[in-house]
Amino acid sequence: MSQLDLNALNELPKVDRVLALAETNAQLETLTAEERVAWALENLPGEYVLSSSFGIQAAVSLHLVNQIRPDIPVILTDTGYLFPETYQFIDELTDKLKLNLKVYRAGESPAWQEARYGKLWEQGVEGIEKYNEINKVEPMNRALKELNAQTWFAGLRREQSGSRAHLPVLAIQRGVFKVLPIIDWDNRTVYQYLQKHGLKYHPLWAQGYLSVGDTHTTRKWEPGMAEEETRFFGLKRECGLHEG
């Protein structure tokens, strides 16, 4: 696979960037998740970062990337509305995996946001998008800038939702390379990896949660529901971090 010039690729229209990365992505599809991480670390520019929501399967990508690149900055965008179990899971994994955790938050506290805007998550798609912009997108953009990131790893999988079904292993988002090492993994592969390495699902998985975000926009899975319907009242799947 040829070397990739981030600056040159960023000058191209989005469609042309996709085409420019097509050959590389075709080859990355043939590699294992570990090989994809190793390739990215060898061929893509640093600084390198890994983002995590510390959701249901978070231990997989955190363990996989961190064992190959110890001390990689792990970005968490904390809304202040995560489940208590999520905060406990963050502490547990940070200690167990010796994570270099970097927590980013909105400039306004949750209480101040509610005083200023009301409960944005109850204000339809527009309100949810504004909430996500304040609490997810802006803090992530700030994290990428402050950490001088040029290559960003994330744990998305195609099986999780229709909006992720056609994502490539390698793309450019927010001006940096974005690598999705486990994009083609199914639920069985995730389970097997967790078992092999003595890792756990998020504590709420045992209570029927397939996806975990904020307390006010996350629902338990019920028969007949798609996984994406358990988030944002079924109005949206993505929080904004992985769009654009």
From Swiss-Prot:
Keywords: Cytoplasm, Oxidoreductase
One GO BP: sulfate assimilation, phosphoadenylyl sulfate reduction by phosphoadenylyl-sulfate reductase (thioredoxin)
Active site: C239 (nucleophile)
Subcellular location: Cytoplasm
Gene3D superfamilies given in the database record: HUPs (3.40.50.620)
GO cellular component, as recorded: cytoplasm
Catalytic reaction annotation: [thioredoxin]-disulfide + sulfite + adenosine 3',5'-bisphosphate + 2 H(+) = [thioredoxin]-dithiol + 3'-phosphoadenylyl sulfate
EC number(s) on file: 1.8.4.8
Record CDD domains: PAPS_reductase
Keyword Cytoplasm included in the entry's annotation: yes
Lineage top rank: taxon: Bacteria
Gene Ontology molecular function: phosphoadenylyl-sulfate reductase (thioredoxin) activity
Pathway membership: Sulfur metabolism; hydrogen sulfide biosynthesis; sulfite from sulfate: step 3/3
InterPro entries: PAPS/APS_Rdtase (IPR004511), PAPS_reduct_dom (IPR002500), PAPS_reductase_CysH (IPR011800), Rossmann-like_a/b/a_fold (IPR014729)
Function recorded in the entry: Catalyzes the formation of sulfite from phosphoadenosine 5'-phosphosulfate (PAPS) using thioredoxin as an electron donor.
Family, per entry: Belongs to the PAPS reductase family. CysH subfamily.
Protein name (database record): Phosphoadenosine 5'-phosphosulfate reductase
